[in-house]
Amino acid sequence: MMCEVMPTISEAEGPPGGGGGHGSGSPSQPDADSHFEQLMVSMLEERDRLLDTLRETQETLALTQGKLHEVGHERDSLQRQLNTALPQEFAALTKELNVCREQLLEREEEIAELKAERNNTRLLLEHLECLVSRHERSLRMTVVKRQAQSPAGVSSEVEVLKALKSLFEHHKALDEKVRERLRVALERCSLLEEELGATHKELMILKEQNNQKKTLTDGVLDINHEQENTPSTSGKRSSDGSLSHEEDLAKVIELQEIISKQSREQSQMKERLASLSSHVTELEEDLDTARKDLIKSEEMNTKLQRDVREAMAQKEDMEERITTLEKRYLAAQREATSVHDLNDKLENEIANKDSMHRQTEDKNRQLQERLELAEQKLQQTLRKAETLPEVEAELAQRVAALSKAEERHGNIEERLRQMEAQLEEKNQELQRARQREKMNEEHNKRLSDTVDKLLSESNERLQLHLKERMAALEDKNSLLREVESAKKQLEETQHDKDQLVLNIEALRAELDHMRLRGASLHHGRPHLGSVPDFRFPMADGHTDSYSTSAVLRRPQKGRLAALRDEPSKVQTLNEQDWERAQQASVLANVAQAFESDADVSDGEDDRDTLLSSVDLLSPSGQADAHTLAMMLQEQLDAINKEIRLIQEEKENTEQRAEEIESRVGSGSLDNLGRFRSMSSIPPYPASSLASSSPPGSGRSTPRRIPHSPAREVDRLGVMTLLPPSREEVRDDKTTIKCETSPPSSPRALRLDRLHKGALHTVSHEDIRDIRNSTGSQDGPVSNPSSSNSSQDSLHKAPKKKGIKSSIGRLFGKKEKGRPGQTGKEALGQAGVSETDNSSQDALGLSKLGGQAEKNRKLQKKHELLEEARRQGLPFAQWDGPTVVVWLELWVGMPAWYVAACRANVKSGAIMSALSDTEIQREIGISNPLHRLKLRLAIQEIMSLTSPSAPPTSRTTLAYGDMNHEWIGNEWLPSLGLPQYRSYFMECLVDARMLDHLTKKDLRGQLKMVDSFHRNSFQCGIMCLRRLNYDRKELERKREESQSEIKDVLVWSNDRVIRWILSIGLKEYANNLIESGVHGALLALDETFDFSALALLLQIPTQNTQARAVLEREFNNLLVMGTDRRFDEDDDKSFRRAPSWRKKFRPKDIRGLAAGSAETLPANFRVTSSMSSPSMQPKKMQMDGNVSGTQRLDSATVRTYSC
């Protein structure tokens, strides 16, 4: 453009001609003038051309505006015509039309009936007229010629009466509508018919009498003739004849009177017949009026039909016109939109041209000014050039510099135009950014509202939890009050202790004597001096002389002999504690003696041994046992109270033991158990070792804090089957129940039944295991906790045994590589119990102490896993508590499965050897996905801990980072599939299970029947697989891509909705909620294009503008944020660029573990870094959940039953 406006001045036509030696400047000045004139002419022509184009564009704009105005007028007129032509109530008109059709049909039926009745009446009337005309004379002459009437006259009267009767009956049926007016006439007609019938009968009778009288009169006349002809007859005969004749005359006169009466009645009948004929005429008149009405109704019917046809034709015409008008309206709309677009474009072009025109005018002015200056300078230089040729050379240089400057000026102007265009683009982008900011603010407002709602809900739930905790605190307060009362009773029982010690020593001597007698009577056991054969410590009571069991104790050599020979060696423990231990053993024997009667009947094998032992025992031994039980019965209450209070006396020693245990760690707990049984630390007859014996009631079990997870599970009624290593029973009134949950397996029920009667058929390995676990040296005398567990059961519940005790001990046969483990768990529990009591007293039952206790327990669990990891033990060598902690923390199994596994699985070898059917039968896991979860977790931890297995890169799955709570609460909502959360949480689906879910599992167990949702789910799994199941990497990438378009692969459903809002499709954005649309679907599914997205957004096909915007922005999104690209041939199909693996290269285990160290337990994944115990609860809180609502939801989801 600038080249046309400002042509460059050629250098060949300048002053070099003057430098050729001619010496005159006159030829160069006209050339410069001509160039300037050409420049001005070209500028003027350009201006004229621009003005012409401006005028043309203005004219076209005016024309288009006029057309648009006309189109608007035409549209308004058509709309008005449409409104006037179409009825307002079309549905009402159709209903009325249907009603009119029904009425017309009814009228046609009535018309047909009236026509038929009219024909019938016409025929009947014609027949009546014929009869009347035929029999008129006979009716008139009936009375006159009654005597000589022939039988034909009767038939004519009968026919007339029949015709009238049929006529009246027909009119009865005809006149239904005028029945009220004709009711009186019909009644009268019926009366007349009856009278007519009666008269007809009387006439018949009179005819017969008349015939008889005729015969009599004929005979009388004959007699008169004879009398006249024979007058010489006697006077007697004449007198007789005269008498009979008088009688006949009287009869004739009577008959004449009767005939006169009948004639009068006949005249009355004629009058009535005349009235009936008048009535018939009236009916005919009514029939004529009905015919006229019928004709009118037919005419109206035809008119209505004609109107209906016209209305239907008008309706069809109007529909056709409406369709044409709609088409024209749509075309006009399209034309109007196109005209608006063209108008906007033309206005923009006009504004640009105006600005360009102003710029050119300014440039022209500047050029003119420069030109004038140049002319002045040129004149001066020409004047000087006449005398100074050097000045001409300088002028030539200046002219060349001026031309270069003009060229540079043209380049600068072009650059200015480019900068202006870029500025306009930036302004548009700024407007879009402001719109996005507004949308983001609206979205933030919605999010704040939802967060407020969630916070209110969480506040309500926390209030409920607070109420429950306050109730638990009240229970603790009541327990403390009971403890204070027990202390008072302890002071009272201190006085009686000396007498009780003396009595117990005497009873012990008698018991030793009875045991020696029982051993001498037994012949089936060859090893009397060897280790006693027992499995459960409660079975000690079966070895006295009254017992029916075949298990007999050896003579008590260890402690008793040492006590008699050298008391100083054995009395290293506290004298009082030792005496209490002896009391406990004696009382356990007596309690078992009382329980043996009920326990005899369980099991056939046990019954054989019991019967054989009865034959060996003497009746005197039974009597001695009975007397011994009667003697001790009175003292059991006081001894029971004293032993319960011994727990409180041991608080200080147990606190010291807990401190030692926490310093030494879990690796040296076995030695600590032995140290406690041999050193100066006294044993724990009631609380510390109670969990290693089967408790008869809850009195012997240590109390735990009520904030523990198993206690919450017990309160929810999910599973109260808690094994001894994790007993959390509140008070001595609480027993271990299974009312609210089924047993863990059928095998557990069978073992519970065997526990009552088959306590004696165990092996020497079990005896060694129990001795090691309780930390004893010399046998049953030194095991005080085994006797204490059944004391209170004599009064409270002598026959009640927990399912957990039977399962835990009979499964304990498999636990051979763990001596002292039960003692370790018991000591740990005792320490926890007493520490809990002391902390409650110090802090006043505050929540801080409960939280610290909970954190300490969690830290101890993590220390177990850290110890196993530090030692490098394979999973098969893990012990029972470590396996249970692994299930609870890393696998994320619910509390009821953890409890069942704690009761049934005692080592990692047992857990790894379980098959699918054994998992279902032994642990009670019936859900196939639950079994899949457990099997995959076992395979993963075995490969992770096996020294021969290759290192895996997916270590994050093994440590519970992406458990089922993360899947249900975070991952599924990020995919836009939160509607399946409850099914996934119920099936405990975690990240390691995602690659193993089949279509059958998705459709059946997880209820994901929509194929599009399954495709979206698979794309989400592919995204996790590409990120190597690294949760931290996923969260980091999502955080980075929150405000800019990149890494669409990791976009969540919310991020896609925000992108939809940012491109200006706000009204359709909410349609993507719960639709399954997320970034991985956009980036990985080749078949998912903008049309599928528009279908999910529910954008109508008529809205071409929104669809065009979506197509443009969708393509830009794929280009900028994904690896999908347009092919050169077809813009609609995409291809995948092979650069994804470069972005996500596989990381080594060390780097991955170091990057995800925050989600792992401390001192486990990375051995070089250690975290303090105080930081551990925070890390676990970060692992478990992200928000307060998710933390609250997890507690409710765990109550599913399998």
Curated annotation (Swiss-Prot):
Q: Where is the composition biased (Low complexity)?
A: 686-700, 1168-1179
Domain of life, per the record?
Eukaryota
Q: What tissues has this protein been observed in? A: Ubiquitous.
Residue ranges with Gly residues bias:
15-24
Residue stretches making up the SAM domain: 878-944, 963-1027, 1051-1120
Q: Which residues carry this modification: Phosphothreonine?
A: 230, 761, 1159
Keyword field: Coiled coil, Cytoplasm, Phosphoprotein, Repeat
Give the start-end ranges of region Disordered: 1-33, 224-245, 426-446, 651-855, 1163-1202
What does the comment on domains in this protein's record state? Answer: The N-terminal coiled coil regions mediate homodimerization preferentially and heterodimerization type alpha/alpha. The C-terminal, non-coiled coil regions mediate heterodimerization type alpha/beta and interaction with PTPRD, PTPRF and PTPRS.
As for family, the record states: Belongs to the liprin family. Liprin-alpha subfamily.
**How is the subunit organization of this protein annotated in UniProt?**
Homodimer. Interacts with PTPRF (via D2 domain). Part of a cortical microtubule stabilization complex (CMSC) composed of KANK1, PPFIA1, PPFIBP1, ERC1/ELKS, PHLDB2/LL5beta, CLASPs, KIF21A and possibly additional interactors; within CMSCs KANK1 and PHLDB2/LL5beta seem to be the core components for recruiting microtubule-binding proteins KIF21A and CLASPs, whereas PPFIA1, PPFIBP1 and ERC1/ELKS serve as scaffolds for protein clustering.
User: Protein name, please?
Assistant: Liprin-alpha-1
Q: Which organism is it from?
A: Homo sapiens (Human)
